[in-house]
Amino acid sequence: MNERKIIHIDMDAFYASVEQRDHPELRGKPLAVGHAEERGVVAAASYEARRYGVRSAMSSQKAKRLCPQLIFVPGRMEVYKSVSRQVHEIFHEYTDLIEPLSLDEAFLDVTENKQGILLAVDIAKAIKQRIREELSLVASAGVSYNKFLAKIASDFRKPDGLCTIHPDQAIDFIARLPIESFWGVGPVTARKMHLLGIHNGLQLRECSSEMLVRQFGKVGLLYYDFARGVDLRPVEAVRIRKSIGCEHTLEKDIHVRSSVIIELYHVATELVERLQQKEFRGNTLTLKIKFHDFSQITRSMTQAQELTNLERILPLAKQLLKEVEYEQHPIRLIGLSVSNPREEADEHRGVWEQLSFEFSDWGK
């Protein structure tokens, strides 16, 4: 059986790079896309800012402490969407099997490609060059025989990187990979892995599938496969929306129940509007809480009936909130999302669970 040829393209510091491209006076300077006010959050950081430790999702106040000369510019989402479409026009000249993950990254299956190019790495080089010449932007590319390895490869030599992981190199490459670099392993899961003595791919490969499922649920099977260089997921040219959510960053931290309930009502109301606009139907509600110290938790519950209106969503959200201890830990952000559309409903209905799998993008 012939190996697949998968490319993962990741635009480097996309939002910040677009701003520096369009505003030459910002080039070479530490830049953050976002708002500088007290409750602001960094949406993206240029590489100049990253050298000071500034990262996306960091509070603007912390970012300014790390880099006092940091320049803040407001985001221009319509511009970023337009540039993303231009990038995808380049992709489509090589393949129509494109799976976007966000505005700035996508998988491409070039096993069969429109240009008849034999080597996937040559396609990746061509795409990178065209993005640079036509759009004045820089992208990193990872090339391998599955999605997991292609994504890992694209992160390996950023910015402006190009890395290929061949089948005969995969096991050794994965063995040395820090567990934090595995796709789907966020800070919470990484800490749990460390407590289990798992710090790299080699140690993960030594774990049985039964042990990983026992510790992490169904996603443990995915970790088991990843450690062996196995990822059978296809590049899905049409991605089915699997969740819709919304979240509010509060003007000030809150811990009084009445204030939390009022804010929960506002978030639930906005969520219902989005569900109705998109005609989305799901039966799992997830509550996301971010505390004043930026730690966060999620709580989820699945119902037999679809969650389509405020009368169903708000009582369930309040029930989820009872699982959160916030009186001593003021809340900074509240989010709600609905997932599990129609036939994808999990068999464990009505069962409380803590979500630890960190792929979710809250429908963004």
Curated annotation (Swiss-Prot):
Grouped into one coarse class, the protein's main location is cytoplasm
> Out of the domains of life, which is the source?
Bacteria
Can you tell me which residues bind Mg(2+)? 10, 104
Question: Which residue positions hold the site described Substrate discrimination?
Answer: 15
Question: Mind telling me which Pfam families this protein's record contains?
Answer: IMS, IMS_C, IMS_HHH
Query: Mind telling me which PROSITE patterns this protein's record contains?
Result: UMUC
Keywords, in A-Z order: Cytoplasm, DNA damage, DNA repair, DNA replication, DNA-binding, DNA-directed DNA polymerase, Magnesium, Metal-binding, Mutator protein, Nucleotidyltransferase, Transferase
GO biological process terms, alphabetically, are: DNA-templated DNA replication; error-prone translesion synthesis; SOS response
Extract the HAMAP family matched here: DNApol_IV
Q: Which PANTHER family does the record associate with it? A: DNA POLYMERASE KAPPA (PTHR11076:SF33), DNA REPAIR POLYMERASE UMUC / TRANSFERASE FAMILY MEMBER (PTHR11076)
Record-given protein name: DNA polymerase IV
Supply the gene name.
dinB
